[in-house]
Amino acid sequence: FNRWTSQPNDNLPNLPLEDLPAGVTLYPTTYSPNAFMVPRTVFDRVGGFNESYIQIFEESDFGWRIMEAGYEGYILTTARTRHYGFLESGCVPELRQLGIEKPFRTYCFARNRLRFARRHVDLLQVFSIALIFAPLSCVYYGFVAIRNGRPDIAWKYLAGTLRGILDCLKGRPKQVASSVRR
């Protein structure tokens, strides 16, 4: 996570699994994509998932809090998962690639990116994201959505960005405890 732009950072180049450097089976990460294992004690210590994120960034927030608690996270490059439903019928591939293929998800993506930044980065960096990067990304994502015939997606991205900026002005978001049962 780039603390100035809120763009994701990879510890290794964004390569297909087959093209990763030879011998790399574990590499450090703060992100916990679609399948992961965490000891229950660690899950409880960091408070589980923050359910206020709704739909996107909850895994990133969880991974970041694990790192802040002094634990390390790794991606096992030899593990395989099947993730069905990547491109549902009616979805535009370019919008799906950006994570903005559905209106509600788009709203949550734009809003939660700013909430995540407010929770995890310095105030100066939050201002950089909220006042420079978020408006620029709003223009970009809006343009891509309109170019793909989805002005509704553009409006939802704008609405989510504005809500995220307002949330940033309110202060750091609270942790909403996970409802996962013990």
What positions do the PLM features span?
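A conserved mid-domain beta-alpha-beta active-site/ligand-binding segment of alpha/beta enzyme cores
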Residues: 110-114
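Non-catalytic, C-terminal membrane-associated alpha-helical segments of glycosyltransferases
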Residues: 122-182
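A short acidic, glycine-rich active-site loop
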Residues: 95-107
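Acidic/His-rich active-site region of diverse nucleotide-sugar glycosyltransferases
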Residues: 1-47, 51
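A short, conserved alpha-helix in the catalytic core of glycosyltransferases
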Residues: 30, 34-47, 52-80
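Active-site donor/metal-binding and catalytic loop motifs
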Residues: 71-72, 76-97
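Conserved acidic
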Residues: 58, 105, 153
